[in-house]
Amino acid sequence: MKTRKSVKARKTVNAGKSTRSRKPRKAKPAGSVVALSNEQVTRVLKLLKGANSVELKFVVPATGHRATIAGIGLDPVEAQPRQAFFFDTPGLDLNKAGLIVRARRIQGGRADTVVKLRPVDPATIDPGLRRSGSFKVELDAMPGGFVCSASLKGTCTAQEVLDVTTGTTPLRSLFSKEQLAFYDAHAPAGIGMDSLVTLGPTFLLKAKHNPKNFDRRVIVEMWLYPDGSRILEVSTKSLPQEGFQVAAAFKAYLAES
């Protein structure tokens, strides 16, 4: 088993070598050559009718992280550090059921929470939930795939998250009554929220960028996992009726960056 220190040391040495001997190679977002089938397009159009927003996301291969950040023109120093905790059973029963329970600490003492279900069919969602200001239906689209999710968000303090993850207070205390009811309605039978274990934390850096050659905000997130692996995600959002047009423009923007 690799320790965090050994992984960091190995990556530091390798990074030093590559920086001096190689020019960063620009990499296309993973899966960028995969197009949706006619059947998938029809399905997306149906889902868009019930969605509040669309998130368009590309995952950049590890070989292209440095070049992508440089090409976008992002200053990594301006990225905001965050710490994400996921909650599930040891056997990941929530994940298998499509249910996500997460708390996220944000720089400055703030934090937020979410209970998310995916996939969902927007047509089957309770109209009462839709009236909540904390509830959102979003279509997550990536090259060659898509999924519709329903989520209830909440806020808390960073200290409250720490109190839960250290066992000082119960997990349910982080979430609102709406979130708890949503969890109870969709969790596998017999799995109460306070029986969940903490997974993580996962450290991430999030940066918001307003490019000159693209007419909307771009979000860049670098996820640094406990095992030493990294994922770089580049995303933007649009209204449902703009989804296909923004997707084409976003793809062109990334290709030129």
Predicted regions and their residues:
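Phosphate-end processing signature that detects enzymes handling 5′-triphosphorylated RNA
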Residues: 2-4, 10, 17-257
